[in-house]
């Protein structure tokens, strides 16, 4: 008999979107156009972007134009991102293309960073199968949270010496909110994801959720997940420590104000424990303000990952990528991150 977990009401957000719709829309099909057919009409609009973003966009356009024998689906992805970024926030079409090209990006970055061991799972069941089959000491996954949704989470996994598996789920937006009665409302999918994991693995696996909260838009969880997985890999000392505490003590937090417990699962405030780089692409200045209020010491931390480039703080980053669209002012840094990763795949993925 499975473990019985009481379910709090779920927070029914945009993540309830049907997964088939998300990944199989006809809008995501690859056209027969050559790369330059779709780039050139939008080139004049790139100058309207913040200078740093414009530079990354032009670099992608150049890479696409110069590429030989490029994967048609990857080329179409790049074309549509270039067409969209010049004029609007990411659309559902871009989100669909994110999903459709995830395998290519995963392959590219696994080759770039030996030991990253990044996987992806199209359903929660597919993730659980990978968890059961893997004996890797350290790996990561970008996984669908619920089989009837399209929202993804990044998961950092450790296999301990005794065979126990520990999972740190990184939520891009908000794993839960509280209603007017102060009752926890979990985001759609979390109750089922955790319950199914405990049913299948019982005491052989432990899980904690880190509420990062960098995403404020309704579309675009996958680029955040990708960055969180990379950050967890590069900050493995911190994550090793979190995993060990979860394994040894059943929780990661060392202070009462760092986390809340809902139905026995720990939900940790990322703003209170994560390094600055996890908020490099935060869309809202208010998010940065919260992080710096919780961790004043990281205000001067360099979040630049460009080798040999100038140092850059969180506040400098959000200013550099600030843009106004549809009466909304926000940082488009995560869009630049998507663009950089597509360019990496175009230049270095060989199938």
Q: Where are these predicted regions, by residue range?
A:
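Cysteine protease-like catalytic core of ubiquitin/ubiquitin-like
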Residues: 133-237
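Long, domain-scale functional regions
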Residues: 38, 179, 183-200, 218-223, ...
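Intrinsic-disorder-associated interaction segments
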Residues: 46-53, 67-75, 95-99, 120, ...
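Intrinsic-disorder/low-complexity loop/linker signature
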Residues: 114, 123, 163, 182, ...
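Contiguous terminal or domain-adjacent regions
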Residues: 237-351
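Exposed alpha-helical structural elements
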Residues: 101-104, 126, 189-192, 241, ...
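Cysteine protease catalytic domains with a Cys-His-Asp triad
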Residues: 2-154, 167
